[in-house]
Amino acid sequence: MPVKLAQALANPLFPALDSALRSGRHIGLDELDNHAFLMDFQEYLEEFYARYNVELIRAPEGFFYLRPRSTTLIPRSVLSELDMMVGKILCYLYLSPERLANEGIFTQQELYDELLTLADEAKLLKLVNNRSTGSDIDRQKLQEKVRSSLNRLRRLGMVWFMGHDSSKFRITESVFRFGADVRAGDDPREAQRRLIRDGEAMPIENHLQLNDETEENQPDSGEEE
């Protein structure tokens, strides 16, 4: 075993970080110690995770995550269609001027309103109830499902709740996993809007996954004071 890899595995940060990565979490610049650790040992950890048929990826935006191959030895589950749509909306909000105006903080209501503005409400309601009639009860269920999706994406490191107030959150650069492919000269925000409105499917390699075994037991570490 290379000396640097042995040092990485012996580091006290590694056990919790390894568990987080395997559960599908993205490690961005906000997690200073973990991110610096991955930067220092990236080359050696890439070889380590390759043994499990997963790739340690550093995205252009700087965050890290594990991308499973078809033969992965790490349990996984694919996010739901609504989870993916909420992720696309989060990416759109990240690109919006409002993010700077609001110091990067959004509310769950703002997320829900943007979702209804950009996506087809009838299709969204069908995701909750295939026999939806557009009733107030169906809309209430949709809002509850959106909250659940946001919480699931928090576990993936896409958002940080503000302290103990889960109604407010800050979006991280990891939402670019849901970003549109932007051609040269294109406006990224407009490209993201088209992705949402056209219902364009994301490439298979970009499908986000979460380890079901840890989803319910993951501590609420993604909070800010």
Curated annotation (Swiss-Prot):
InterPro entries: MukE_C, MukE_N, Scp_MukE
Gene3D superfamilies: 1.10.10.2250, MukE-like family, C-terminal domain
Alphabetical list of CDD domains matching this protein: MukE
Biased composition (Acidic residues): 212-225
Subcellular location(s) per record: Cytoplasm, Nucleoid
Subunit structure as annotated in this protein's UniProt entry: Interacts, and probably forms a ternary complex, with MukF and MukB. The complex formation is stimulated by calcium or magnesium.
Protein name: Chromosome partition protein MukE
Gene this chain is encoded by: mukE
